[in-house]
């Protein structure tokens, strides 16, 4: 059972502050990208395991850090008894991403560049295409993929920011058939401003922010119970 807290007790942050917090974690505080990626992906997998029954899961991974979170999430989902398949439409040359690919390949997790032809065999899709640095609109090879996912009606779990959303303003108005409208979301570190009015299942993970960094930015951080890595936000 995931501990529930009021979303009024945590800060919602914009794109600039989110980037600043990451930069400070990687420099002043000595964290490595792969450390935080592992924690983020594990938190996402824990939220999924708490909210959904074991099933086939299609994990859509972009070439950046959000995609890395997706690879880690897929690996942990397999450990939790799910059957993940990764969709990786745009490969990264980054050595960390290459390592994550190897980790999943050697765990016999399928990796393809396109959506499965039997997409309806996957009751859940994990959206890990774009992170908080994304600026609309979407571009290929992602646009058509997002349209297919949107039209499928399959439940989508988004990691941090739903694909196609402006990080601060949320889903664009008008023609948005290439924009994910998720059924559930996990925010990482702190929820972004685009999630302020979100009313669906909303998890939060990222139990690693040093107190001095919290104090510097006067942030409201969640009170995680015991040794839990995620909480659930409600009104």
From Swiss-Prot:
Give the enzyme's main class according to its UniProt record, as a single word. Answer: isomerase
Q: Name one GO cellular component term.
A: mitochondrion
- InterPro entries in the record, alphabetically? YjeF_N_dom (IPR004443), YjeF_N_dom_sf (IPR036652), YJEFN_prot_NAXE-like (IPR032976)
User: What is its cofactor?
Assistant: K(+)
Q: Does the keyword Nucleotide-binding apply?
A: yes
Enzyme Commission code(s) on record: 5.1.99.6
Q: Where does K(+) bind?
A: 66, 127, 163
Keyword terms of this UniProt record: Isomerase, Metal-binding, NAD, NADP, Nucleotide-binding, Potassium
The residues covered by the YjeF N-terminal domain are 18-221
Cofactor binding comment, as recorded? Binds 1 potassium ion per subunit.
Source domain of life is Eukaryota
Statement: the UniProt record of this protein carries the keyword Nucleotide-binding: yes
Pfam families from the UniProt entry: YjeF_N (PF03853)
Q: Which reaction does it catalyse?
A: (6R)-NADHX = (6S)-NADHX; (6R)-NADPHX = (6S)-NADPHX
GO MF, any single term: metal ion binding
Q: Which NCBIfam families match?
A: yjeF_nterm
Report the PANTHER family cross-referenced here. NAD(P)H-HYDRATE EPIMERASE
> What family is this?
Belongs to the NnrE/AIBP family.
The free-text function statement in the UniProt record for this protein reads: Catalyzes the epimerization of the S- and R-forms of NAD(P)HX, a damaged form of NAD(P)H that is a result of enzymatic or heat-dependent hydration. This is a prerequisite for the S-specific NAD(P)H-hydrate dehydratase to allow the repair of both epimers of NAD(P)HX.
What is this protein called in UniProt?
NAD(P)H-hydrate epimerase
Q: Which organism is it from?
A: Caenorhabditis elegans
